[in-house]
Swiss-Prot record:
The keyword Ion transport applies. This is ATP synthase subunit alpha. The keyword Disulfide bond does not apply. It comes from Streptococcus equi subsp. zooepidemicus (strain MGCS10565). It is found in: Cell membrane. The lineage of its organism: Bacteria, Bacillati, Bacillota, Bacilli, Lactobacillales. Keywords: ATP synthesis, ATP-binding, Cell membrane, CF(1), Hydrogen ion transport, Ion transport, Membrane, Nucleotide-binding, Translocase, Transport. NCBIfam families: atpA, PRK13343.1. It comes from the Bacteria.
Amino acid sequence: MAINAQEISALIKKQIENFQPNFDVTETGVVTYIGDGIARARGLDNAMSGELLEFSNGTFGMAQNLESNDVGIIILGDFSTIREGDEVKRTGKIMEVPVGEALIGRVVNPLGQPVDGLGDIETTGFRPVETPAPGVMQRKSVFEPLQTGLKAIDALVPIGRGQRELIIGDRQTGKTSVAIDAILNQKGQDMICIYVAIGQKESTVRTQVETLRRYGALDYTIVVTASASQPSPLLFIAPYAGVAMAEEFMYNGKHVLIVYDDLSKQAVAYRELSLLLRRPPGREAYPGDVFYLHSRLLERSAKVSDDLGGGSITALPFIETQAGDISAYIATNVISITDGQIFLQEDLFNSGIRPAIDAGSSVSRVGGSAQIKAMKRVAGTLRLDLASYRELEAFTQFGSDLDAATQAKLNRGRRTVEILKQPLHKPLPVEKQVVILYALTHGFLDDVPVDDILAFEEALYDYFDAHYDHLFETIRTTKDLPQEAELDAAIQAFKAQSNFK
């Protein structure tokens, strides 16, 4: 058989033309320093800020400081096996977390990996942890109420869907209990809840998860935990991971409640990282961009326009104060970013007023427009009445003689304080809150002994459930009060057959 040189030449040329080089080109560097969750590496000249980098042991890090001769990296995981001289390579991606329905009911770390021992999470969706907040024209005004189930909040400092409401107070004043009760009250409200535990003890997180499970709230809740024993980078990244998971639902037209427990610990973790990365310290040794740390997180909570699905993220960030000082650096930063604050006071907590909400220092800047009409009508003057009672109470400690009008105000004030108390993990539907506050503001409790107020309240609910359920139904469906004459008659009928005189 004759060999045709031209044919062979043409064949070789064709092969060369069709050749696709299959090189895997990655930029690699060398670790020059490692310790305390921080690494420095040389040779990553083209690394991007926030880019995910992979170490030779499979651990990932995030590029933070891009300097002329090296890159400062925060390590997102175990750094005990990383050594100086180890290889680190660029991935070309920024950090993402898994998102979607599969995460609901699970406990995950800030990387989206399950830590509850219930197996892998099957999801294909991912979102970057750092994304721009919705712009002005992409937002809508807050107008839908978010009922927490706590009378003191829903009446005095109402929260709307899409709002950021700070919960601030000393340690052990019931901040977490307020948020957990708010989550429990979202059952059947078509809300997804995300609880982000930052720097908490693992035993504490376990207790909260068990509480959510016991009351059936884990069916619509994701728990993101970065416990106190984990490296600072994970504490720093946890809130951003939580809000990335929330954004997936918001941009699909759903409503989300996200709790950050607490942002003081995130600020401390960020200060630690910044000092280790040798960034210049500012006030209280926090870096200059600590305001931006929290503003870029909380601005991602919003009520978005109908064009984007009309979903919302409502944020309840926590700040822990020292000796009730709400004028501290981080506290004032977050107060200025949020749409209001609920201030929990240690003195009130210790005197048995729980939730220990200080009505004078607490405010909701946008929630009033989201409050239902019935609640507006019964709770309109409640805040002023309470403030006036506190003032009179302080004055009467001097033992002055009181006229009848002042005595009546004091009596009403004592009953108001009693009515606003609420047992732990027993959130109330809004229609029950409206009825008891109506009874209070219309003088039906003025002749009930203060010690019997809570028993009166329970008995009133039971009586209405049995005989006047249609009044509850009216408030539920119309969001307004039923006929006042009918409501008055129902409460009078209850008082006539009860032992509360």
